[in-house]
């Protein structure tokens, strides 16, 4: 059995920087045509020059791959700065509520404050797309749900602004997407295939710790259903986020799952299991092209076959290991050719 996927798109990707970028980028740049690149670096991408520098670094270490750059939402995003970014091809803003995830200490503390709303008004006028880490302070399993009132306010106040709920994790958010024309979402492999049991049902597995948390069986099943039918307002976004094993095995575990090396084989396996392979093309590419109005992307054909793929346990960077999701397991699908 074989399947060919055309122009895969990852609508939410972390490729880090410097040596770590060089170590992990190929896992995404080789099989994917494009990816929306997250701006939460150690020094966040708060303006056009820093964003373009990072874009150049990615382009210097990849080929036939389009990084879709995003700006880190901050009070310095004046109308002039947004116009400058737009002129250079930057179309995405990423809003991090302060302290909600990795490198979000510089995030937005007042989501409905006057400055935030002013920036969103300008973003709407210029046709930016707003990607939001939709969590607010509260009980860990309810953080996305607690952000619903903010999402509704944004959707109603800025009806022409496309708003993406990144890494949808709570089944209660589905109704919001279906209610508001300008609300969309991305789904990760881990949120549609894993639950809290994978994180802490046995021994604690730090390599399954992410934000937002993987949640209950009901959440996983409802989100998987969206993916399997390639809901037109949903696109695939891996949120692949590598960390060194030494950090993952520390007393202060960073959030992030490194899934990039297995994404397409694992999705084929999952969709085949549920008799939905015919919808994988839409989920992995077609929906994103429509939602984000993407064209002129590098053309790619990725041929996968139903042959065993033993997932490596890790990859290396500067003699440090980075654990790979499902490392040591055997997947039933594997990439045979990328053209």
Swiss-Prot record:
Under the heading SUPFAM superfamilies, the entry gives:
Metallo-dependent hydrolases
Name the residues that bind Zn(2+) 1.
12, 14, 94, 239
Pathway(s) served: Pyrimidine metabolism; UMP biosynthesis via de novo pathway; (S)-dihydroorotate from bicarbonate: step 3/3
Q: Which Gene3D superfamilies match?
A: Metal-dependent hydrolases
Query: A GO CC term?
Result: cytosol
Q: Which UniProt keywords apply?
A: Hydrolase, Metal-binding, Pyrimidine biosynthesis, Zinc
Q: In the UniProt entry, which residues are flagged as the active site?
A: 239
Name the Gene Ontology molecular function terms of this record: dihydroorotase activity; zinc ion binding
- Residues that bear N6-carboxylysine: 94
According to its UniProt record, which cofactors does this protein need?
Answer: Zn(2+)
The keyword DNA-binding is annotated on this UniProt entry: no
Give the multimer and partner information: Homodimer.
Q: Give the protein's recorded name.
A: Dihydroorotase
Please name the source species: Helicobacter pylori (strain Shi470)
